[in-house]
């Protein structure tokens, strides 16, 4: 499963180089096996860390088609939509993630990838749903 990461961290030159090398490697794997979910997850995370949000979004959309019942895939898709300023789509993906069982409310509240989304009016109604789910979870 991918790690929680954010593209907001300033990356050192060595880290950028390592990420670029890993991206190139993972792109090769995905070219050979376009349905390799684990490779796609790593590639999407690396694109996001590197600030390559449109490419990360393409990967997350691909993952959503391959893993339609995976709550974390839809959470990451919401992050990609938020990072590309597609806020209505981000809300829809986040709603689906919650319907599928995503429950890491603490991370959702502070994830920097969703910062701009949380400032949007569309997020308000979703915030109410999140509060109800938190109460239910106990």
Task: Identify the role of each PLM range.
Residues 11-15, 27-85:
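Alpha-helical adaptor scaffolds
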Residues 71-72, 100-110, 137-138:
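Boundary/linker segments of alpha-helical solenoid repeat arrays
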Residues 88-105, 128-135:
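TPR/TPR-like (Sel1-like) alpha-helical repeat modules
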Residues 1-28, 138:
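Long, contiguous interaction/recruitment modules in multidomain scaffold/adaptor proteins
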Residues 39, 71-72, 114-125, 133-138:
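Accessory recognition modules or surfaces
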Residues 10-19, 103-129:
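TPR/TPR-like alpha-solenoid helical repeat scaffolds
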